[in-house]
């Protein structure tokens, strides 16, 4: 009886050991647990675990639970089994041309107008010779493996106390931006004065007139209750935030090739799914909620004038050549 008990315990212990994942990735992002992205990251993690039969486990941490983005990226460079949701502006700090993807009107310069065309354009960008070269440099020189950048968060517009229809309307306005040089140069090129303010401080900044407005998505503005401190939403659609999902190239190379493929495939799939949902459904829903709060939407914007003005940002940042090369490779122009 005792031998049987010992044998049973041994079988249970061995079974537990074999059931444990061989590879674990801790994935960090700064968004709240209620955001569509968090749900999409969880879906990606579940799909990977199922397809690898439990060999690969991705643990998702929302609200920057593992730390601030800058610290996590440095740990990733050092080879830690971590992942981070970031953007091309941040990756452009290592390989400058990659930052082109988060400059004003990038996706428009790629010829994309509909959500479907946005995803198609990004797929072509990923397959372009230039992007492959830049991604290889990120991976081999700086230790960042980009799993996917088919993750977009919707178009950003200007939310202010006055209507914005052309670049001249932004003259003298202090517009809140993230502290990224690429972002700030974009807003400066469009005619405004960029002011770096933390996301959580935007409401107070506009309320106290430390800033005259912000450039955000409808979802950002609604969730932050900014409809209480602005009057107009001017639909410039100047930036479509393209997110990069990155992990350590050292960790990624430790995986069997078939697992590498699964992780990338499922990351692309989850990203496209949530991006389409945001662009086709959620953005419009938040816009309608915004209107219900009494905010005036300005849709008759001179987009051509804004796109022309935006070119100065590419020139100032020294990446106009990168933009023109991608236009040639993606659009054949």
Predicted segments with their positions:
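Signature of the catalytic double-stranded beta-helix
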Residues: 119-135
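Short, low-complexity disordered leader/linker segments with a strong preference
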Residues: 1-24, 333
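N-terminal secretory/targeting leader peptides
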Residues: 19-120, 137-333
